[in-house]
Amino acid sequence: MRRAVVVFSGGQDSTTCLIQAINQYDEVHCVTFDYGQRHRAEIDVARNVSHFLGVVAHKVLDVTLLNELALSSLTRDNIPVPDHSESEKSAIPSTFVPGRNILFLTLAAIYAYQVEAEAVITGVCETDFSGYPDCRDEFVKALNKAVSLGIARDIRFETPLMWLNKAETWALSDYYQHLDFVRSQTLTCYNGIQGNGCGTCAACHLRANGLEQYLNAPEKIMTEMKAKTHLV
């Protein structure tokens, strides 16, 4: 039996990865992390989405220690969440949470070890990575090697969205006939608003632009997505 663990936030990217994983693996588990994020509504959204999609198990892990160590506008009420125009001016935006993906992927791999899963799946993306250094392909591959050595098991870190832009990510959800579900039921917004979000933060801006691009040229973008992902 093929098993996978999805690092799951309930956002567009991780939900798209989860939908694909359900189509590719016999058994899928989700891991969601409570790190004291301001947009805590994502935890409830993640529970609801994973239940609706029928995963085998969904773990919510308390990693609030990260909140004590990592200064970010996603974990501190006194640091404002920038709108998309402000985010574009900074190489590393204030929404970056230092060490987040290091911790998440490592803990997900430990859980994968426990349930004998062959893969940990994450929705990080270098094409639209918003300036986050821990969303880069180089980082994920390096950590994958270190973790596999550390637990003496070849658990594979999969990044299905790594080279897709946001429009192509929408195409991937449409390929699996879940575009409307992802559009209405996920939470990507840094201000914690489900669906279309606040419309002003960087995450909402990226998501909305990608959707508009896809809806304006669905056949072209679907073809490009299939070529990148080797889907038929």
Swiss-Prot record:
The keyword Cell membrane does not apply. Binds 1 zinc ion per subunit. Keywords: ATP-binding, Ligase, Metal-binding, Nucleotide-binding, Queuosine biosynthesis, Zinc. Pfam families: QueC. Zn(2+) binds at C189, C198, C201, C204. InterPro entries: QueC (IPR018317), Rossmann-like_a/b/a_fold (IPR014729). Signal peptide: none annotated. GO terms for biological process: queuosine biosynthetic process. GO terms for molecular function: ATP binding; ligase activity, forming carbon-nitrogen bonds; zinc ion binding. SUPFAM superfamilies: Adenine nucleotide alpha hydrolases-like. ATP binds at F8, S9, G10, G11, Q12, D13, S14, T15, T16, C17, L18. Pathway: Purine metabolism; 7-cyano-7-deazaguanine biosynthesis. Its EC number is 6.3.4.20. It catalyses: 7-carboxy-7-deazaguanine + NH4(+) + ATP = 7-cyano-7-deazaguanine + ADP + phosphate + H2O + H(+). Its cofactor is Zn(2+). Belongs to the QueC family. PANTHER family: 7-CYANO-7-DEAZAGUANINE SYNTHASE (PTHR42914:SF1). Catalyzes the ATP-dependent conversion of 7-carboxy-7-deazaguanine (CDG) to 7-cyano-7-deazaguanine (preQ(0)). This is 7-cyano-7-deazaguanine synthase. The lineage of its organism: Bacteria, Pseudomonadati, Pseudomonadota, Gammaproteobacteria, Enterobacterales.
